[in-house]
């Protein structure tokens, strides 16, 4: 028997057997152990979830703003009370270090839910005077039933990022977690029910993106899809959504983000920022600053500081709280990252450190790849052009501000960017020219609930978090009122 046993679908406020009974395994990437069997949804299950959501959504939307706010705040309290339990599940399912999941994943997800719970009473329309006898007022009404499709790197955090604004605005959600990391989304559904969310307002369907995800994006009963994943999948989501019922779409599709270090930067601080921008979560973060631009005159000194820091990384069992670097999410993904590393070697980049999978002792049973740093990289190399989503840093040298801005923008992505400098005039001047939706000055990676998150170019459509996202889960109804007479031309 696996550690977490058989996991059913969550529909209409309860665990429910799938129509087919087909299952797939959840695997701990630290040791290859099967930790759960998950039921795979099919078209019947999708229809059932949509029907439940359609029934529950009007009940939820009819509650007062304060009632909805109180229920979501109760969910926040339960999340925080169960933080350690959820962190342990997340670590087993993703391979992320417990030191990380315990302090970040559930904590930041709960913060987002609390933020939107507080905004619910502030969601209001406008009154617009026209003339003495007439005015217009607007209402912000929920879209109805919406779908969220998550990625595998931050399972419960992404589920909360998507569900919090949707529920706050009065919608019902059907959430499909990544088939690689599904367990905590099911726990979140339990928590919402325990907090008092009406049945059918939050449902979880597990299964593959090619099947369940496509069914959701094409379903005529769903008004909006919020998707996190890769560009190729995002294009399919947009095409399916437009080809079915012209659904509203929000997408975050990853990046190949530049981190620019200027000559006046504190080099120790710059190295620390570059480490966090490349090796946190074993490099499996969509906003990673994997293209690190360094002035040619500082390159050797910077590289020395990076190598020193990489050697201090504590790689090991993610359930050991001393570990700060765990395995990649799956063996398949490990192999993909290794192919990129091999490509970097073939194309002539200089390997400073790492560049291999870890196979000594207990690590041999897991999907571990050593933190890897390449230097003397060129802009046309595969490791510089494509999103690797792993612990691979590329160091590139430059000569001038104008040059580095041009090269930083030379990518199809536009998710994130950052600069490290003591000259704030330069910092703002450069940031304003970088084609990226999320930018950091002298820091990297933090995204507070108040901060809209999303990308330019191929990195996405729309934003998550912040006030504007709440509004995007509503539709505006305009009503004109005439208090005086009405004159017809007929």
UniProtKB/Swiss-Prot annotation:
Coiled coil location: none
Positions of post-translational Cysteine sulfenic acid (-SOH) modification: 286
Binding site for NAD(+): 150-152, 176-179, 230-233, 254, 286, 387
Keyword terms, alphabetized: Metal-binding, NAD, NADP, Oxidation, Oxidoreductase, Potassium
Pfam family, one: Aldedh
Record note on cofactor: Binds 2 potassium ions per subunit.
EC category: oxidoreductase
CDD domains named among the record's database cross-references: ALDH_F9_TMBADH
Substrates-to-products reaction catalysed: betaine aldehyde + NAD(+) + H2O = glycine betaine + NADH + 2 H(+)
EC code: 1.2.1.8
Stored InterPro entries: Ald_DH/histidinol_DH, Ald_DH_C, Ald_DH_CS_CYS, Ald_DH_CS_GLU, Ald_DH_N, Aldehyde_DH_dom, BADH
Superkingdom, taxonomy of origin: Bacteria
Family matches, as NCBIfam families: BADH (TIGR01804), PRK13252.1 (NF009725)
HAMAP family referenced in this protein's UniProt entry, alphabetically: BADH (MF_00804)
Subunit structure: Dimer of dimers.
Protein name: Betaine aldehyde dehydrogenase
Gene that encodes it: betB
């Amino acid at each position: 028997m696996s550690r977490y046993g058989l996991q059913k679908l969550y529909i209409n406020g309860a665990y429910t057997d799938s129509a087919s009974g087909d299952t797939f395994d959840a695997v701990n990437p630290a040791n290859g152990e099967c930790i759960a069997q998950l039921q795979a949804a099919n078209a019947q299950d999708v229809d059932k979830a949509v029907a439940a959501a359609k029934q529950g959504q009007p009940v939820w939307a009819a509650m007062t703003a304060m009632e909805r706010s109180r229920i979501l705040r109760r969910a926040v309290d339960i999340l925080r009370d169960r933080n350690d339990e959820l962190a342990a599940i997340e670590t087993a399912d993703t391979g992320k270090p417990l030191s990380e999941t315990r302090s970040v994943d559930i904590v930041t997800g709960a913060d987002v839910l609390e933020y939107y719970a507080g905004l619910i009473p502030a969601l209001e329309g406008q009154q617009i005077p026209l003339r003495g006898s007439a005015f217009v007022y607007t209402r912000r009404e929920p879209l109805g039933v919406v779908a969220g499709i998550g990625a595998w790197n931050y399972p419960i955090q992404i589920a909360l990022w998507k569900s919090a604004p949707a529920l706050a605005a009065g919608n019902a959600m059907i959430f499909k977690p990544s088939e690689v990391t599904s367990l905590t989304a099911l726990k979140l559904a339990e928590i919402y029910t325990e907090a008092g969310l009406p049945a059918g307002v939050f449902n979880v369907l597990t299964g593959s993106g090619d099947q369940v995800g496509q069914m959701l994006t094409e379903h005529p009963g769903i008004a909006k899809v919020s998707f996190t994943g890769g560009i190729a999948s995002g294009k399919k989501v947009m095409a399916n959504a437009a080809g079915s019922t012209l659904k509203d779409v929000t997408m975050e599709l990853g990046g190949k983000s530049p981190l620019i270090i200027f000559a006046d930067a504190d080099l120790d601080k710059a190295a620390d920022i570059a480490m966090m921008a490349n090796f946190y979560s074993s490099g499996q973060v969509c906003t990673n600053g994997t293209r690190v631009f360094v002035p040619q005159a500082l390159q050797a000194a910077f590289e020395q500081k990076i190598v020193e820091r990489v050697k201090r990384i504590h790689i090991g069992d993610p359930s050991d709280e001393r570990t700060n670097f765990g395995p990649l999410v799956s063996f398949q993904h490990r192999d993909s990252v290794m192919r990129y590393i091999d490509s970097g070697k073939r194309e002539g980049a200089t390997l400073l450190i790492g560049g291999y999978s870890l196979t000594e002792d207990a690590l041999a049973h897991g999907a571990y790849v050593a933190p890897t740093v390449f230097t003397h990289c060129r802009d046309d190399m595969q490791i510089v052009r494509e999103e690797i989503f792993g612990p691979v840093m590329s160091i590139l040298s430059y000569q001038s501000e104008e040059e580095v801005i041009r090269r930083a923008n030379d990518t199809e992505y536009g998710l994130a960017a950052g600069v490290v400098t003591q000259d704030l005039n330069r910092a703002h001047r450069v940031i304003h020219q970088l084609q990226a939706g999320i930018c950091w000055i002298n820091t990297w990676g933090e995204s507070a609930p108040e901060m809209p998150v999303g990308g330019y170019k191929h990195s996405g459509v729309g934003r998550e978090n912040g006030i504007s996202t709440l509004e995007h889960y509503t539709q505006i109804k305009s009503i004109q009122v005439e208090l005086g007479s009405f004159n017809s031309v007929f």
